[in-house]
Amino acid sequence: MDRHIAFVSLPAHGHVNPTLPVVAELVRRGWRISYVTAERFGPEVEKSGATLVPTAGRLPGGPGPGRLSPAVLAGFLERITADARDSLPGVREHFRVDPPQAVCYDAMSITGRVLAATTGAVDVALLPSFASNERSSAFARVGTPPPEILAAVRDMKELLTSYGLDAQMRPGMLPPASLNVVFVPPEFQPGADTFDDRYRFVGPSPSAREDDGGWTPPDEPVLFVSLGTAFNDRPGFFRACFAAFGGGGPVAMAVGERVLIDDLGAVPANVDVRPWFPQPAVLRHAAAFVSHAGMGSTMEALYYGVPLVCVPQMVEQEVNATRVAELGLGVRLDPEGLTADDLRAAVDAVTADAAMRAALDRMRTATRSAGGAVAAADAIEAHLAV
């Protein structure tokens, strides 16, 4: 039988990036991988050794400045549903002709869930963030979702039901697959001991992305500042960072594609501002990370033992930031009313805290011991052999 696995991801860096080292590891073991996601991720997908199966990829890049509203977040869920509705006919036909043995899909992907169910392939859910079950849900702390979110979830359920799937889902808790690969270590997952053997907590694999991208580290540890790739249209935040850290040690600041560097004003001499940095390479040399607390960025920081100053921009990031603070791995700041003094004080605090340093060292060991891409590939192969 052809050793063929389909991967299906949402068209967002935080969802695609954690899966690519797993793809590369499976390719190294002789598997043929077809990867379903937006065409703009083609170069990264093909570099991992997979063949791209392109979709429309409708997820937006994020809203403009200002706090995210429930309507904006609901819009993201609606885009996931619309992308699945448009993509499923072509994707199903592609894999009818070229069936996979397994479908490894992002847990939020309707396309992946439907493809696994309708092809009869082994289903493997990929979770770039926390897992949830009836006993442990990090998202339960957020409270009852607003009506806009509930309406978007109902639309998801209707599409799943139209393909014959049992759509028992609610915000923050998705039906598990027969195998669920979670890209966080068990020590970071709330209530990890409440999950059964369908779950594998494998942590991240940032060392697979350590290409320096042309960046040369300075002679002393760098402060890294980034709000990720989606919710980063925050020029006021970046100007506050100029005020907080200008004139000090070296700073690497990633502002994304929507913020024009020229619009930020005078750039301090010690600050290197770019749309993008090779994040794992920078974190290897970082003293601290001022971050949006996206799970991918959080995991990469912990892999390298870097303390976090979390400035979350949306609900999922708030959950991650709260967990970081609970475990003594960094601090969480409220983005509303944030000042340069707040930022400077937070960075000074996390870099001087001996107890935090010890907690980071323990979590770095745990994160590296979780197994990463090798453990994920082992779990997928073992599941296919059952």
Regions found by a protein language model. Give the residues of each.
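Anionic group-transfer/hydrolysis microenvironments
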Residues: 108, 184, 228
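Glycosyltransferase specificity loop/lid
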Residues: 1-149, 154, 236, 252-303, ...
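Active-site-proximal region of nucleotide-activated glycan assembly enzymes
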Residues: 122-191, 196-197
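Donor-nucleotide binding loops and adjacent catalytic segments primarily
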Residues: 189-288
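Catalytic-core helical/loop segments in enzymes performing group transfer/polymerization on anionic/lipid-linked
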Residues: 8-9, 29, 36, 165, ...
